[in-house]
A protein has these predicted regions:
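Pocket-flanking alpha-helical
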Residues: 13-47, 131-132, 152-157
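Extracytoplasmic/secreted envelope proteins and their assembly/folding machinery
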Residues: 18, 78, 102, 106, ...
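Ligand-binding pocket segment of bilobal, Venus flytrap-like solute-binding proteins
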Residues: 26-30, 97-166
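C-terminal lobe and pocket-closing loops
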Residues: 150-201
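C-terminal functional modules
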Residues: 200-259
Length: 259
């Protein structure tokens, strides 16, 4: 807005986001998680209806995790879990039933992978799983759970991700890269906005902080973003490099003034 544009933010499902870009209803989608969204996004990209602009977040994670004290005790891989079945009560704590993460855990159990055939996945919710973790950590009770980053859990708890679950969660600790997508032709029609979008990349630390402010402290998203950019002028400078206001003015002072 400080650059002179009038953006509109719509919260929609992933399939609707891609159909909307194809139909010119939406211009930009910042949440193309790959490879998990490949089956949805790739057909639009292959047909030339959507363009993949830039990777805006790298090294995201999604796999099993433990408190740091459990990791320090020698449980660093999913291969170490069965050896400590008693401490873990043969339970892997997940989130809501039917979630893809829970389904992957159940598949591990069904396959008797890593010696986990007689374990069980505990269906709960994100809040319920983290409440259980909060209750166990003060007494250093053992627990293995579904973890992911970015998420405030990474700053609220000392935790570590378990290696070697590649066959189920994928390589690099269930690694994902998030891309910015645009409707085909948008960058050519709005090159200045395209420059901004190309510059807008995020880090895990940044997103963990922002999500914690919003989810744990109740800060409004717009206010959380404003606070972060005010405290990190280097990020703002990098995002606005080569960008002008809509009428061709200097972008940086315009945005700094709005902050």
């Amino acid at each position: 807005e400080a650059l002179g544009y009038e953006p509109r933010v719509d919260t929609v499902s992933v399939p609707i986001a891609y159909a909307g870009m194809r139909n010119n209803d939406f211009d930009v989608f910042l949440g193309n998680w790959m490879p998990s969204m490949a089956s949805i996004s790739d057909p639009y990209i292959e047909r030339g209806e959507v363009e993949r602009l830039v990777a805006n977040l790298e090294d995201a994670k999604y796999t099993l995790a433990v408190p740091q004290y459990v990791y320090d005790a020698g449980v660093t891989s999913v291969n170490d879990l069965a050896e400590h079945a008693e401490q873990f009560e043969q339970r892997i704590h997940g989130i809501e039933a039917g979630n893809d993460g829970n389904e992957l855990i159940q598949q591990m159990i069904d396959d008797d992978a890593y010696g986990l055939g007689d374990w069980q996945v505990i269906d709960s919710s994100e809040a319920g799983m983290l409440a259980e973790l909060s209750a166990r950590v003060p007494n250093e009770k053992w627990m293995v759970f579904l973890g992911w980053e970015p998420h405030p859990m990474n700053t609220n708890f000392e935790m570590a991700y378990l290696s070697d679950a590649d066959d189920y969660f994928g390589p690099n600790l269930g690694g994902a890269t998030v891309y910015t997508n645009t409707r085909t032709g948008f960058i050519e029609s709005c090159p200045n906005v395209g420059e901004l979008l190309s510059n807008m990349t995020f880090t895990l630390e940044m997103e963990n902080q922002l999500m914690s402010a919003i989810m744990d402290e109740g800060v409004e998203p717009r206010e959380a973003a404003r606070d972060y950019l005010s405290a990190h002028p280097d990020v703002l400078e990098a995002w606005l490099e080569g960008v002008t206001t809509r009428d061709g003015g200097d972008a940086l002072p315009a945005v700094q003034s709005a902050l």
